[in-house]
Amino acid sequence: IQTRYANLDTIEEDYGINLLPLATFAMDKYAGDPCEQFKPKGDEVLSDKDFNMIAKMHKAISIMQWKMEGQIIKRRPEFRMENRLLLDKIDFEKGTVLVDGVEYPMNDMNFPTIDPKDPYKLTEEEQEVMDKVKSSFVNSEKLQQHVEFLYAKGSVYHIENGNLLYHGVVPMTAKGSFAVERFEGRRYSGRALMDYCDARARRGYYAPEGSAERQNGQDFLWYLWCGRLSPLFGRSAMTTFERLYVEDASTHTEVKDPYYTWYNEEAVCRSILAEFGLPGTSHIVNGHVPVQEKKGESPIKGGGRLVVIDGGFCRAYHEKTGIAGYTLVYSSRTMSLRTHQPFESAEKAVRENLDILSQKNILETENHRILVEDTDEGEVLRERVHDLKQLVTAYQLGWIPEARCEDHVW
């Protein structure tokens, strides 16, 4: 993804990860390949040399990615993602690939590292590159701090002050019921599916190093990124391979989960809230999909029960959406949505004294001011006060003996 948008500074400079092994490998293996389909996108100003090098890096790491994804799919048949095994569907003589049983011509047939007899096996050189890159990731202190923070503070969903927050979807069927997925011999749907996904993802970080459980969790983290019923993905497939190699646009389609149709219905939003033990007056705060406001799309769904928040971090979407994202503000009186207008950069805004314009839209006004005691934090404070009172009572009744200085060894 970072090579696609020429955003390698984040990896190399911010996280201190060495990409030289990948660059050296790519420049060697794809020396005479223009890598047309892999040229970086975006408005980053690059020299021709850097532009071509990043394109080659993009192709090299993509091939390795598809090989390793294929290994996961074969290792985890429960994911039911065999339709994403495409490297073994390439006909190297005819220059075609089978996608969902249909043969399509390919626009690029330069695969110097793929063995048609064993297409998902990394070459020795590829394995060496992956080992070095992995070592850099594992030994990046800042990256590990950020990953630790995500596991400590993050979750697949979160309930805060009566609001249900999640990134992607609660997988649904075309009839509007919660979709059922089977993992490790059990069926899950709705909240139970979200809880399962959260727990299994944690195995990939907290299970003992080198254990089967840790590998199991790490494989599942990949499923969460692009799996057919992943609550974090919400689409039928990630068709990156087809977009790069097949000109026929029909293969590029990524069918959205029925959730994206049903979340417009207030009754469905209320059923989702009920699934998570919340009243119908609560709100769902949803992310993941940019809202195309310039085409008239509204971020407010389901009769006001659901709000779609796109933070606008991906500049590439600004032209498509017509905005630079939203900020949801929840105060003691109101819940409001701030719509930000596109701007080039914060640095330019400060340098040229430009206004960063935002439009305020009040979604809901409370009849009475919400106090700290009315919030989840207030409940935590109440419990602490109760515990302290219990402690004082226990001390006053002599259940906790007074400690004297001579009892301690200093």
Segments and roles (model prediction):
Residues 1-410:
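Feature recognizes metal-dependent phosphohydrolase scaffolds
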